């Protein structure tokens, strides 16, 4: 209850408390939410120190300064709306990070139409403790009646002391106060008087609000840009121009700054960034030329399987750590274990995906280029030109088909597959959903129907199949849960093991169908995993494997996927332990088919060239060459990364990894420039090739 003896100056001060108190409360609450997000990232070398708090506060001030230009009522409404919007952004980033270990970018938002399709995957990432993000909303709802009552009391006392109320019957005063009940309208009441005085007072109030807002903007920019400049001129030098992980940018700019920079980067790419110089383009061409020459090895395996059909199966979330493993005495992947005996099994094969996940694996495996640091090539640059497996094989007389029992628009596949040269893309509309499972059709029926479609096509063919049944959140109907996962029962890790066991059974049926249809002896069958399972809890892997794990162990587990290549005659079977990656698949298959990639714009190595030390670079900047293994720090500093010996698994001096790191960063930059600037089209036009 405010004392009725308060004069007009006191009530003006009270209005200032409302205006600036609500603004400071907004800053405090939003900083808490940013801190809550940060505390759930658990990223090495990413700490929220004092300067990071300063950046956060400055960014919030720069984003909200304009609310101080409004009336008190308008300001409070604007702050509530801004609170809701920023909370939605922060929480969306947290959910996205739980699955992708990354933040949302603008290219990802352009794929927002796919969110509805994710369904249970998103639900599984929601935690009850996340309700803390809405705690301030609950307080506002509960406290609103009290605040409203206080506002009316303030307005009533203002009316009683205003010139307009002088001489009025006391019974009329409440009516006036009802009309002007809200505290924000006090300014209007206080301004009543001679017209000139009223206008002068309003003008002064607007000048004060404008000045305060601009002062907050200048201060906010100073608090945010100052520390960022300090970082980028010292330990984070070159960060904003390099091809770094989003976490590295976040560590310097803060969350809001990261999103501002992401918008700038997107606009630069699409509205018109700095063009590449002729010298830069020549350097890129020279790199591709040298890489092509190193791949062009004409040994006994070159062309050994010329004219063979090719079936490539990209298996959802199939990771390498389960191959050959048992749980409760039962093999998790019995059919893949059997296939391994007659196939080339690459036990140190790495997925090289980024934010595009499945679409990135598709792109890297078929185009032998790195995915983008932000978004997916499929959705951003589907109209650009690439040297891809389906088109290259079509140029030599093959027919090319893609199979995926899901919506053709997902990941913009229909448009991308047309650009890649596929003769036909069989999507969900082309399948009978007679085995509904997970996202769509179960893999067993998917393989059966896909092979039936292939039987009607001419040979030789290139067939690219994408499975779905082992997709997050790994839910199987009870009748398909045939693996006893023991103590993992009821956990998502246990569900994942069940899902992979089901997919393994589907692969076993595929092999038998190929034999029955006469395809086994004239087809190269390639099976690999597209990416990890997004389950990062180290304790589950240690429990499953029965041993403690190091940082290097976990890095390999989360980045290695199996690769099986079964050749028509079963030759060259065995386990290959050299490090290889998804970029290496296309040039290696072309080598077996006798098609040179010397003049192709590909970045991958030829797995059959006899070199045991191919450099495999991941999108994060991690790399291995079978001798050294480098794990980067999220802060982007080379010196804060860790260099390991592959032979011993022990940490070695960081300088031993410097030369390879320089090459790794160069490759990522060349690939990004090639994709973004559509350089392959430009280079081939210059060379007179179609």
Model-predicted regions and their roles:
Residues 32-45, 92-97:
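Juxtamembrane "helix-exit" motif on the non-cytosolic side of transmembrane helices
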Residues 19, 23, 79-163, 173-176, ...:
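N-terminal secretory/membrane-targeting segments
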Residues 287-690:
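Solvent-exposed soluble domains appended to multi-pass membrane proteins
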């Amino acid at each position: 209850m405010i004392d009725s003896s308060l004069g007009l100056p006191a009530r003006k001060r009270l209005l200032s408390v409302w205006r600036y108190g609500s603004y400071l409360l907004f800053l405090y609450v939003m900083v808490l939410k940013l801190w809550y997000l940060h505390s759930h990232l658990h990223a090495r070398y990413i700490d929220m120190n004092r300067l990071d708090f300063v950046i956060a506060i400055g960014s919030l001030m720069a984003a909200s300064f304009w609310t101080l230009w409004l009336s008190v009522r308008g300001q409070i409404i604007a702050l509530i709306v801004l609170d809701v919007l920023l909370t939605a952004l922060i929480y969306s980033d947290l959910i996205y990070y739980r699955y992708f270990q990354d933040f949302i970018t603008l290219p990802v938002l352009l794929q927002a139409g796919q969110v509805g399709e994710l369904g249970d995957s998103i639900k599984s990432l929601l935690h009850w403790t996340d309700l803390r993000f809405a705690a301030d909303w609950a307080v506002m709802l509960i406290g609103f009646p009290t605040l409203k009552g206080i506002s009316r009391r303030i307005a009533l006392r203002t009316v009683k002391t205003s010139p307009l109320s002088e001489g009025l019957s006391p019974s009329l005063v409440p009516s006036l106060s009802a009309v002007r009940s809200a505290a924000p309208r006090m300014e209007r009441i206080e301004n009543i008087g001679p017209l000139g005085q009223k206008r002068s007072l309003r003008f002064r109030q607007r000048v004060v609000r404008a000045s305060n807002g601009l002062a907050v903007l200048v201060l906010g920019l100073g608090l945010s840009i100052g520390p960022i400049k300090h970082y980028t001129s010292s330990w984070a030098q070159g960060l904003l121009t390099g091809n770094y992980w989003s976490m590295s940018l976040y560590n310097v700019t803060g969350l809001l700054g990261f999103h501002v920079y992401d918008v700038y980067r997107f606009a630069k790419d699409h509205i018109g960034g700095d063009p590449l110089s002729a010298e830069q383009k020549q350097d890129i061409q020279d790199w591709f030329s040298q890489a092509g020459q190193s791949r062009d090895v004409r040994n006994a395996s070159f062309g050994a399987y010329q004219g063979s059909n090719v079936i490539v199966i990209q298996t959802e979330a199939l990771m390498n750590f389960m191959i050959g493993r048992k749980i409760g005495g039962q093999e998790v992947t019995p059919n893949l274990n059997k296939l391994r005996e007659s196939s080339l099994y690459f036990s140190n094969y790495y997925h090289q995906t980024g934010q595009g996940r499945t679409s990135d694996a598709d792109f890297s495996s078929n185009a032998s280029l790195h995915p983008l640091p932000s978004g997916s090539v499929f959705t951003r640059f589907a109209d650009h030109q690439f040297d891809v497996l389906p088109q290259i094989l079509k140029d030599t007389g093959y027919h090319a088909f893609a199979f995926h029992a899901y919506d053709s628009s997902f990941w913009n596949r229909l448009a991308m597959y047309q650009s890649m040269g596929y003769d036909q893309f069989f999507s969900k509309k082309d399948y009978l959903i007679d085995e509904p499972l997970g996202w769509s059709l179960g893999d067993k029926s998917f393989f059966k129907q896909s092979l039936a479609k292939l039987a009607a096509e001419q040979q030789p063919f290139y067939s690219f199949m994408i499975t779905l049944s082992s997709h997050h959140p790994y839910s199987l109907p009870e009748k398909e849960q045939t693996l006893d996962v023991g103590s993992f029962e009821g956990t998502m890790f246990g569900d994942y093991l069940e899902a992979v066991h089901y997919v393994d059974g589907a692969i076993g049926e595929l092999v038998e169908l190929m034999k029955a249809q006469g395809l086994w002896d004239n087809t190269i069958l390639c099976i690999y995993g597209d990416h990890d399972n997004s389950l990062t809890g180290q304790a589950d892997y240690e429990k499953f494997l029965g041993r403690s794990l190091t940082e290097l162990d976990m890095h390999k587990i989360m980045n290695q996927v199996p690769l099986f290549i079964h050749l028509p005659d079963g030759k060259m079977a065995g386990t290959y332990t050299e490090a290889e990656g998804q970029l290496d698949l296309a040039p290696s298959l072309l080598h077996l088919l006798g098609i040179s990639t010397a003049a192709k714009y590909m970045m991958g190595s030829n797995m059959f060239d006899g070199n045991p030390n191919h450099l495999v670079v991941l999108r994060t900047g991690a790399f291995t060459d079978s001798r050294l293994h480098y794990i980067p720090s999220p802060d982007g500093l080379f010196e804060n990364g860790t260099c390991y010996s592959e032979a011993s698994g022990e940490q070695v001096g960081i300088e031993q990894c410097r030369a390879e790191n320089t090459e790794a960063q160069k490759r990522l930059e060349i690939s990004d420039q090639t994709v973004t600037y559509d350089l392959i089209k430009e280079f081939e036009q210059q060379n007179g090739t179609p």
